[in-house]
């Protein structure tokens, strides 16, 4: 059997392989969001959407059995989960096909199992199939739900989603940038014509010019100087040291 599966993997396309992986019988793990997102993007290609539809159709037809096995329960449940995801994120072409084949979903409203331990899974399948049918039969609700999902995906800038219109995000980014620039201008300190270095230089030069100091005034007794009365002292500058460069 593993050899047969290996042979089948060579003849099936990568798209078919992805859909089969998302709807396999492994109940320990479901399809990841990344895998379902890749499949939803592939629905926008005319070629790959046909391959996706082909695999999903075969999976849904498993529910026609009156006594479904445990394996069928797992595969049908995973297929309905993928269908629900593609209804919100897939192309209009996929939605159109789904509306034209609602009989495949309607059959699952009466899904039956052969093992009583699978009764809970059967109830989940019946409930999910009714939810899918409710959306398919209400165009307004389906359209609103798809728009809400697209808007949410746009808000988180999902890479690779070409069908997403994120023009409102670009406008918001532009507004944020203008606001940031405005705040930076307000917070920027005013510039002066004299820099701090220049002020320091001026202060340093002032100290250089003041290397010498004036000596205190000293009194000298006059010695019969003409024009000066005796006993009257006169003032003179007396340097403190001989190191004064101006002496």
From Swiss-Prot:
Disulfide bonds: none annotated. InterPro entries: ENTH (IPR013809), ENTH_VHS (IPR008942). Coiled coil: none annotated. Keywords: Phosphoprotein. The keyword Ion transport does not apply. Gene3D superfamilies: 1.25.40.90. One of its GO terms (biological process) is endocytosis. Residues 7-146 form the ENTH domain. Residues 179-247 are annotated as: Disordered. The keyword Phosphoprotein applies. GO terms for molecular function: clathrin binding; phospholipid binding. One of its GO terms (cellular component) is plasma membrane. Present with 1960 molecules/cell in log phase SD medium. This is Epsin-4.
């Amino acid at each position: 059997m593993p050899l047969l599966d290996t042979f089948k993997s060579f003849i099936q396309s990568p798209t078919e392989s992805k859909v089969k992986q998302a709807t396999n019988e492994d109940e320990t793990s479901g399809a990841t969001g990344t895998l379902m997102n890749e499949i939803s993007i592939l629905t926008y290609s005319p070629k790959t959407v046909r391959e996706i539809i082909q695999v999903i159709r075969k999976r849904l037809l498993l529910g026609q059995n009156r006594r479904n096995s445990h394996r069928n329960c797992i595969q049908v449940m995973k297929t309905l989960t993928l269908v629900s995801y593609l209804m919100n994120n897939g192309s209009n072409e996929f939605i159109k096909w789904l509306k034209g084949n609602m009989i495949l979903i309607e059959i699952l409203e009466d899904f039956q199992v052969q093992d009583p331990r699978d009764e809970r899974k059967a109830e989940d399948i019946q409930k999910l199939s009714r939810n899918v049918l409710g959306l398919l039969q209400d165009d307004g609700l389906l359209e609103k739900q798809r728009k809400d999902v697209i808007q949410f995906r746009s808000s988180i800038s999902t890479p690779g989603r070409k069908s997403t219109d994120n023009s409102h995000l670009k406008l918001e980014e532009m507004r944020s940038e203008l606001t940031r620039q405005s705040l930076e201008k307000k917070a920027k300190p005013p510039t002066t014509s004299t820099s701090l270095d220049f002020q320091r230089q001026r202060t340093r030069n002032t100290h250089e010019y003041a290397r010498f100091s004036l000596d205190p005034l000293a009194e000298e007794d006059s010695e019969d100087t003409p024009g000066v009365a005796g006993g009257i002292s006169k003032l003179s500058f007396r340097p403190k040291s001989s190191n004064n460069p101006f002496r």
